[in-house]
Regions:
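A structured beta-alpha segment of the ubiquitous adenosine-cofactor-binding alpha/beta core
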Residues: 70-107, 111-120
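A short, basic/flexible loop-to-alpha-helix module at the beginning of a structural domain
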Residues: 1-17, 24, 204
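Glycine-rich adenosine-cofactor-binding loop
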Residues: 13-50
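A conserved mid-domain beta-alpha-beta active-site/ligand-binding segment of alpha/beta enzyme cores
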Residues: 156-213
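Glycine-rich phosphate-binding loop and adjoining beta1-alpha1-beta2 segment
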Residues: 43-81
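Phosphate-binding loop/pocket of nucleotide- and phosphate-handling active sites
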Residues: 1-2, 224-296
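ADP-ribose/adenylate-binding Rossmann-like module
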Residues: 107-150
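Oxidoreductase and adenylate-handling cofactor-binding alpha/beta cores
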Residues: 151, 213-232
């Protein structure tokens, strides 16, 4: 209560958060919101925890390997607040359940995979229809970025990702989203061979620094959005096309309303540092991952 008033605290208690995807950032955001007082959650994730998730997801423990992520997430929230209401969707978000998933939500956290653009599009379209803001966080390197899609504004998820706002979901499912669309920040210390590996289909690498930073940015934006519901507008959320990023490892932070320009500006710096060999080398090429047994 030393940081907000009674109205804000009550709004936090009354808020329902819908979380699509119980990965690193989504999981931490949910747990931290539970600790500040959010009591109602709807969580969707069809996947089970694997060993590889242990580098960034609080829910991964020896005894949770092989268990559904959403169900473990629910149990961890209830361990913080036994009176919390948590609904889980172990089939993930589907066309059949997306309306029910958002039926009581005040805020949606879209932590779905961008390699399935139809899923993120479906979530954001349903949220727009219901007038619900969508929080989007991404982590890259040891940093992260955040933006919010406001249902009352013209800059939509599809527009930001370079997708047709009127295209059917089946058509969007065949699209590939360029990294210049969903990343506004590239760390100058990054090894560009990692970026090339991602473009060739390797999973986006992650660690606890980046995931933790994404969680802090996400929680901060969530609190701003909750406070706006009771008329507290001192801190404005980062509404798209604006994107805010933070990299505690590099000691840099920034905000832009031109995300693609920001991407290419950061990329240019990274290219120069890679050519001059002043970057930090990584082991994420296909050959390096094959030697570790990460790929077939």
């Amino acid at each position: 209560m030393g940081f907000w008033n009674d109205a804000t605290q009550q709004a936090i208690l009354d808020t329902t958060i819908a979380i699509g995807g119980a990965g690193g950032a989504g999981y931490m955001i949910g747990l931290e919101l539970a600790r500040i007082g959010v009591q109602r959650f709807d969580i969707a994730d069809p996947e089970v925890f694997e060993d590889v998730n242990s580098n960034r997801v609080f829910g991964v423990r020896d005894q949770t390997i092989g268990l559904n992520k959403a169900e473990v997430f629910r149990d961890d929230i209830l361990a913080i607040n036994p009176e919390a209401e948590v609904r889980v969707y172990t089939d993930g978000i589907t066309r059949d359940n997306v309306a029910e998933f958002m039926s009581r939500a005040d805020l949606v956290l879209d932590a779905t995979e961008l390699n399935m653009p139809d899923l993120g599009t479906m979530v954001c379209r349903e949220a727009r229809r219901r007038g619900i803001p969508v929080l989007n966080v991404e982590y890259v390197g040891h940093g992260a970025q955040v933006t919010v899609f406001d249902p009352t504004r013209r800059f939509t998820f599809e527009r930001m990702m370079g997708l047709d706002e009127n295209a059917p979901l089946d058509a969007i499912a065949t699209q590939t989203i360029s990294s210049s669309r969903f990343l506004s920040y590239i760390p100058k210390y990054g090894d560009l061979r990692t970026l090339m590996a991602i473009r060739e289909g390797a999973p986006l690498p992650s660690n606890m620094i980046g995931a933790g930073t994404a969680a802090q940015l996400g929680v901060a934006e969530a609190v701003k959005l909750i406070r706006r519901r009771v008329g507290e507008k001192h801190a404005s959320p980062t509404f798209a096309p604006r994107v805010r990023w933070l990299d505690p490892y590099a000691g840099v932070a920034g905000r832009t309303r031109l995300p693609r320009v920001s991407y290419y500006r950061h990329l240019a710096v990274a290219v120069v540092r890679n050519k001059s060999k002043s970057h930090e080398t990584a082991g994420y090429t296909k050959d390096a991952r094959a030697r570790r047994g990460d790929v077939d």
